[in-house]
Structures are given as structure tokens and as C-alpha cells.
Amino acid sequence: MKVWMAILISILCWQSSAWAVCPAWSPARAQEEISRLQQQIKQWDDDYWKEGKSEVEDGVYDQLSARLTQWQRCFGNETPDVMMPPLNGAVIHPVAHTGVRKMADKIALSLWMRERSDLWVQPKVDGVAVTLVYRDGKLNKAISRGNGLKGEDWTQKVRLISAVPQTVSGPLANSTLQGEIFLKREGHIQQQMGGINARAKVAGLMMRQDDSDTLNSLGVFVWAWPDGPQLMTDRLKELATAGFTLTQTYTRAVKNADEVARVRNAWWKAKLPFVTDGVVVRAAKEPESRHWLPGQAEWLVAWKYQPVAQVAEVKTIQFAVGKSGKISVVASLAPVMLDDKKVQRVNIGSVRRWQEWDIAPGDQILVSLAGQGIPRIDDVVWRGAERTKPTPPENRFNSLTCYFASDVCQEQFISRLVWLGSKQVLGLDGIGEAGWRALHQTHRFEHIFSWLLLTPEQLQNTPGIAKSKSAQLWHQFNLARKQPFTRWVMAMGIPLTRAALNASDERSWSQLLLSTEQFWQQLPGTGSGRARQVIEWKENAQIKKLGSWLAAQQITGFEP
């Protein structure tokens, strides 16, 4: 019962998310956006299938194709799930290529597996599909996948690939095999190295007119033997004996989705001889080959890896002012998952950097995780037809502005509060940006230290602050009064590192105000430029006013 409930919840969540990502476009706008992306994908298809080149990463192509399908569903212009590649060859496949249906997640895979037995998992090798036809023990023909029914004659090319056996015997002497021509790799770790655009590279090599030695950089992984031995173990043994050893090495029996998940995760992290983009689970029992048709395979499914980088739609562009007054640009995204992390925002950087990227709401950007799991922009992969970019705020802020609240200072003022509450400054646990905004909106702070005057009753009656949390906050605010003098000076934004400030041995506000530029310049890591900044800072009227206010509050080091 619990399993079926989990499946139902998964389906409902998927449906909800599917509807949620439908753009709020007029019919005319939808038609224009869909048409433009259709034309681009068609151009990429023509480049790939006819010329063997790719102007776009495989993962980006796959995700934008899925995005196009989603838009078509949203606006009633849905096309069949299986998109047939353009016909660019007249050689008929002895057995049609069926393609493989993708499973959304482990729950969907588990549901599919419950109805089947004698199941096996293989890596979903990333390359180009091929048919190998053997007659009387010799390689008779090699055919590109094409549209699944017909393809190009690749016989001469494949004969130059040393990894493909040219002669076979026994049951394989008169057989038709289907597999993947792949780019041979040494110790490829998918988790670290990604897809390296392997599919397009293989297609390019196979499309070249010259019979280059580079074809020996290709290998083959046979994943189907239509009308072959009934037992999978017999199939694998015969294939290995003939020279198709990879199939036996990388085909494992599985009983449930948990076992598939373990193998999938192991291959994701292991050193493999090829690039992969997931796993394929297949039943050993297959229908007769005469029943195989494109898009009709019910005996196998794929469970793809989550891409290292995801295509995300930009919903809004927002501007943030940091404590130093610098304006940064943040893109709010339609949520995507990256390595089990839900990503909804990505920092673009400065206004100039944003203008160089030329990013507007509605654009599609490629996002990945940098060090420490921080989202980053890798590329702008698609720009919308209608592009309206917001106007950035005037650059009127600097490191000495917005210690006191005002309408124009809202963002920098909040940034200063977030900074002073951080662990490395006053260590106010339990309050972040949202909490500071709630306090300031309710109590209208005069300056960055006004929170010291809040009473337990005021905190308890602050909308957005839970009553159970208000007592904890009041306790934190009181503890802050006992923080060392240097922590309070850091909270005031002195332009020095903590190491330099500690080395100064300043222990009172009056002593600090008397220190000269020469004194500051001799501190570690503090040059003449930084020393002048310290002088400008301590002579600033807002800073002097804050120092006097803290003295009135009898904060350590500020007392007269």
C-alpha cells in the first residue's frame, strides 16, 4: 500500500510541476517562441545527421528538445513522443531500431520492473547507434540508425574500426546485431568528466569523407541480438567469444530498482572505457524481430543520469546591494535539481558582467555547481523572442553609505545587518536576511545597531518572527553586548582584515580615533591605500555618530 501511495504522490507531483512550468504567454507569443526553437533544433538536427557536426553540447540539445516538447504540450501543439531523425539513407535495417523509453525516476522504474522478470542492466553508452549484419561468418553490412527503419551504408567505415570483429562463427555467423559505436576512453569517470560531447564527436568521425586512422579511436558496444539465444547468459557468452567482450563485462542481472540504483551509482563513479548517460534495463525475453518498430519497445527502458549541468529558465533579474555598496545581479530561476540540490537562484556578478552575458527574463541558461556546491552560469543557450531587461539601480552607494536607514538605502542597509549578525562578526545565531527584513519593516530601525533597543515584547509581536524564537533572539542580542571591542568595530565595517585589526591591539574607540595613517600602514597586509581608507572611515560622520551611540549603550571599548 505504501509503495502505491508513493507512486501516486510521485505522479501527482510530476503533473503539478509539469503544469507549473507552462509559460504565461499569449497564443501569438507561444507560437513565435515554439517556432523559433523548432527551427533551431531542426538546424542542429540537419548539422548532426547530414554533416556529422554539432554546434551544441549533447546535453544542451537534449534538454532544449525536452523544453520544446513541454511548450508544445502547454499550448496544445504536442508532437509524438518519438521524434524520427531525418531520413538520410536508403539502406533498410533487417531489424528496426526501437529506441528506448526514459524513466523519470526510481519509482517509475520500480513500477515498470514489477510486471517483468529476468531483467538485466547495461550502461547506456553515449555514441551513435548502428546495425551490424553478419552473413556466412563475415561482416556483410553496417547501417547507421537513421530513422530506425532506414539508414546510411556505413560498411566501409565500420570495416576500418579494429574493435569491430570482421569475422564471427557459430550462432553469430548469420546474425543481426544492434549496438553503439562509441569514442574509446581510458578511465572515463562520468561523475567528474561529464559527456564531453561524445555523441557528436563519433557522428563527426563517421561522416568524414576520408577514411582516417582516427576510426580506430572508436569501439562498439552490442546491446541487442534480435532472435538470438533465449537465455541472456548464452547471448553474452557467444558475443564475448566472438570479440564483443564489453557486453558480457557490463551486463548485470537485477531483481529490483534498488539493485539497478546501486549499479547505476557505481558506474557513475567508476572508471569506464566509454562515456555513458545512464543505464538501460532490459528483459531477456524479447518479441520476434519482425515485430520491432521505432518507439514500440516495451521490453527495455532507460534511466538516465541527471545532467551535470541543467538548462534553467530565467524568471526574473534582481539587483542586490552588498554591505560595501557594490551592486550585484542575481537571476531567479525556474527550479532545477543539481546533484540533489534545488537551485532557484544564481549569482551573475556585477552589472557589467550581466550586460556582457546579455541575460533577460525568459532566456534559457546552462547552470552547474562550482566549488562548495555554489550554482554558476556556464552559458546562455537560448534567448527568448521578447526580451525586456530591468534597469539597474543608480550606482550611488559605496563602503561609507547606508549605516542609517532610508528608502534608497534599503538593500545596502539590510546587507549590513546580515553581515554584522554573521558568525565571524557578532555571531547572532538564528537570524538571517528574512529575519532582519521583518524586524526592520516592523520597528523601522534608525541605524544598524537599533536592534539593541528592542524589548522582549517587541520581538514577540513582530510579524514573521515566531514567538518561540523571539526569546532566543532577545538572548542573542543581549549576549552581543559582551562581544569584544574588535567585533563591534568589524560590525561597523572598518576596512581591515580581522588579523590586521587584532595586530593593532586597539582596545578602545578613543584610542582608535587617535591612530594615524602611519600606524595603520605598518599593520600586516595593510598598505598605504588601505590605511587611507581606514582614516576616511573613522572620520566619516555616520561612523562617529554610531561610535557615540554605542558609548551611550555602554558597549565594551566605547565607554568615555
Curated annotation (Swiss-Prot):
Main EC class the enzyme belongs to: ligase
GO molecular function: DNA ligase (NAD+) activity
Coiled coil: none
Alphabetized PROSITE patterns for the sequence: DNA_LIGASE_N1, DNA_LIGASE_N2
Keywords per UniProt: DNA damage, DNA repair, DNA replication, Ligase, NAD
One of the protein's GO biological processes: DNA replication
Pfam families: DNA_ligase_aden, DNA_ligase_OB
Enzyme Commission number(s): 6.5.1.2
SUPFAM superfamilies reported for this sequence: DNA ligase/mRNA capping enzyme, catalytic domain, Nucleic acid-binding proteins, RuvA domain 2-like
Heme in keyword set: no
Enzymatic reactions: NAD(+) + (deoxyribonucleotide)n-3'-hydroxyl + 5'-phospho-(deoxyribonucleotide)m = (deoxyribonucleotide)n+m + AMP + beta-nicotinamide D-nucleotide
Record-annotated active site: K124 (n6-amp-lysine intermediate)
InterPro entries according to UniProt: DNA_ligase_AS (IPR018239), DNA_ligase_B (IPR020923), DNA_ligase_CS (IPR033136), DNAligase_adenylation (IPR013839), DNAligase_N (IPR013840), NA-bd_OB-fold (IPR012340), NAD_dep_DNA_ligaseB (IPR050326), NAD_DNA_ligase_OB (IPR004150)
Protein task: Catalyzes the formation of phosphodiester linkages between 5'-phosphoryl and 3'-hydroxyl groups in double-stranded DNA using NAD as a coenzyme and as the energy source for the reaction.
Family the entry assigns: Belongs to the NAD-dependent DNA ligase family. LigB subfamily.
NCBIfam families: PRK08097.1
Protein name in the entry: DNA ligase B
Source organism (scientific name): Escherichia coli O17:K52:H18 (strain UMN026 / ExPEC)
Taxonomy of the source species: Bacteria, Pseudomonadati, Pseudomonadota, Gammaproteobacteria, Enterobacterales
